[in-house]
A protein has these predicted regions:
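Gram-negative and organellar
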Residues: 1-299
Length: 299
């Protein structure tokens, strides 16, 4: 859905949106460890059942929309909104987020430059978990008829409502290269770096990673595979734990949109993803397999 929305946003359409709805089975809905106890500097810590790995079947809905309103030659007003949520029978694991951005799009020649400011909110278990205010600038530059380069810089402030020791600044930078291999296939590579500060240096982190994407059209079926890797380092150790956070994360996924079975523009969607996080702090060490089986549509 994100790729559908990004494609529409890169076009000159004055309005665009995408929507997704489906069932979402997940082996680890809370991205938690499967260990019953954790080692601490005092004594082994027993974890409650809801603090450990929990599987579940959720209902997932997500949507995004934008409006492009011309202000002058090569300049448009560009508001964007998005939201997504996964709801479970056990509401303590419900995960909902929403964001809104107001910005401009400047299009000198073939370039696209978009400065924007916005806010995002996340609710977990029915409670406001975090809110973030951000300022972003992204740039897109076609290299030739088959490839393009993109870059983005974001600065923001984060406010964690349940633990203010995590509050701090958020900095993110990314650069992406996309290429069409032929009329029916293509791919891309994205490099990402993130810095997050916090009142407690144990929650402050720096991370970097790479994401790979390959997509291909098979008749009226759009298929894709993804692969990603990420490294994270904590500034200091968290209270109770003997080591500071040092993590490797591996993610992989694949899916397909079956347009041959579309009904009134809504097409079946199948997506499967795998995630494994190795951490020196047992609380963050987990594995996860999840899927989405639903419908999607881009407008």
């Amino acid at each position: 859905m994100v790729n559908q929305f990004a494609t529409a946003l890169r076009s000159r359409k004055p309005i665009g949106a995408s929507f997704e709805f489906g069932l979402a089975p997940d082996s680890n809905i809370n991205r938690a460890t499967d260990s019953a106890t954790l080692d601490t500097i005092i004594a082994p810590l027993d974890l409650s059942r809801d603090a450990r790995q929990t599987s579940g079947l959720g209902v997932r809905a997500a949507g995004q929309a934008y409006l492009r309103a011309p202000l002058a030659k090569d300049l448009s007003f560009l508001p964007r909104v998005s939201g997504q949520g996964v709801l479970y029978r056990h509401s303590a694991f419900n995960d909902v987020s929403a964001s809104a951005q107001l910005g401009l799009e400047w299009s000198p020649g073939r370039e696209r430059i978009r400065p924007s400011a916005g806010a995002s909110f996340r609710w977990y278990g029915g409670q406001l978990y975090a809110r973030t205010a951000t300022a972003t600038i992204d740039w897109q530059h076609p290299l030739d008829g088959k490839s393009q380069l993109g870059a983005a810089l974001t600065a923001g402030t984060t406010d964690y409502r349940l633990n203010h020791l995590q509050d701090g600044m958020l900095w993110n930078a990314s650069i992406a290269y996309e290429r069409a291999f032929d009329a029916r296939s293509g791919g891309g590579i994205t490099l990402v770096g993130t810095r997050q500060t916090a009142r407690d240096p144990g929650y402050a982190t720096v991370s970097g990673g790479v994401d790979l994407l390959y997509w291909r059209e098979f008749g009226k079926t759009s298929a894709f595979v993804t692969l990603g890797g990420r490294r994270l380092e904590g500034d200091a150790r968290l209270f109770l734990f003997p080591d500071r956070r040092r993590e490797w994360t591996l993610s992989a996924g694949g899916g397909a949109t079956l347009r041959a079975l579309a009904w009134h523009g809504f097409a079946p969607l199948v997506r499967v993803e795998f995630e494994r996080n190795w951490s020196t702090v047992g609380l963050y060490d987990y594995r996860r397999v999840a899927g989405t089986f639903g419908i999607t549509r881009a407008f």
